[in-house]
Amino acid sequence: MSDYKIWVDADACPNPIKEILFRAAERKALPLVLVANQMIRVPPSPYINQIRVGAGFDVADQYIVYHVEPTHLVITADIPLAALIIEKGALALNPRGELYTVDNIKQKLTMRDFMEDLRGSGVHTGGPDSFSQADKQAFANSLDKWLVRV
C-alpha cells in the first residue's frame, strides 16, 4: 500500500474538483478520503472513502490535521487549515490549483485576516470569483504535478 494519500476538506469542495479527484484515485490506485460533516456522494471504489464527522466549527479540519502525514496532499480552500497542514510537513492545494507553501502561507493568512477584519467593520469586500473552467484546469495541472511523484 502506498504511503501517499489525498485528503479533501469536502464540505466546500466544488463538484468538478471531486470528479477530477475520483478519476485520479482510480487511475493511480491512490487512497482518497473526503471528510465532511454531511454525506457526500462518492462512487463505489476500493480507493475512495468518505468520513462523516460531527457538526461543529472546524471538526472536519481537526480530523484531517490529526490524520495527515508528510507524504499526503490535502485539498482545501481553508487557509488556516492549509497552514496547519504545512506545519505537519504535508502539502495543501486549493481547488483553484494554487499550492500553499511555507513561502506563501503567512502572506495568505495575513490577507485573510485583513479581509475578515474589513468585513467585521462593515466594509463589503465581495467574494471570490465564480469557479471557472480555467480554475478547474489549473487544479488538474497542479494535481498532475503531484501525482507524477506518486
From Swiss-Prot:
Q: In which family does this protein belong, per the annotation?
A: Belongs to the UPF0178 family.
UniProt cross-references to NCBIfam families, sorted A to Z: PRK00124.1 (NF001095)
Put simply, this protein is called UPF0178 protein Sbal195_1808
